Amino acid sequence: MPRSRINGNFLDKTFSIVANILLRIIPTTSGEKEAFTYYRDRMSAQSEGNYAEALQNYYEAMRLEIDPYDRSYILYNIGLIHTSNGEHMKALEYYFRALERNPFLPQAFNNMAVICHYRGEQAIQQGDSEIAGAWFDQAAEYWKQALALTPGNYIEAHNWLKITGRFD
C-alpha cells in the first residue's frame, strides 16, 4: 500500500483525497499520475522525518516528471533534505539545479544564502576572516536575489544586509 494511503495525519489525508479527485478529473498521462504519487509519498515521508525514503521518492519523481517547473520544486525539496542532513554542498547543488529550471524561487536563494552565512560563521570560528568574508559576500548576493523576487520578505536578511553594509 502506498505510504500516502496509510498516513494518519488529517491534513495529509485531506490533501491525498483532493489530489486523487483532481487526478481523476484533470486530463493527465499515466506518467504524470505516477510522478505525482511519488511526490505525494515523499511529502508524507519527509513530514515524518524519514529523509532516506523521501529522497528515494523524490528521485523516482524526477525520473518520471518532465515539466521543468515541477522538476524545479522536486529539486528544491531534495535540497531541503540535504540541508536538514547537514550536507550543505549537496544542498547548494540541488538549489542551483532548481533555479536553472525556475529562476523565480526566492526560497532557494534564501536557503543558499543561509548556507553561505553559516559557512561564513564557521570560518570566523576557525579564525579565517578572509574566507568568512567571501562566504558572507556570497550570502549577500543570494539574499539580494531573494529580496528582488519578494520585496518585503526575508526581513532579517534585509536587516543583516543593511547592518553589514552589503545592501546597495
From Swiss-Prot:
One of its GO terms (biological process) is photosynthesis. It is a peripheral membrane protein. It comes from the Eukaryota. Keywords: Membrane, Photosynthesis, Plastid, Repeat, TPR repeat. TPR repeats lie at residues 35-68, 72-105, 120-153. PANTHER family: CELLULOSE SYNTHASE OPERON PROTEIN C, TPR REPEAT-CONTAINING PROTEIN MJ0263. Essential for the assembly of the photosystem I (PSI) complex. May act as a chaperone-like factor to guide the assembly of the PSI subunits. Belongs to the Ycf3 family. This is Photosystem I assembly protein Ycf3. It comes from Cuscuta reflexa (Southern Asian dodder).
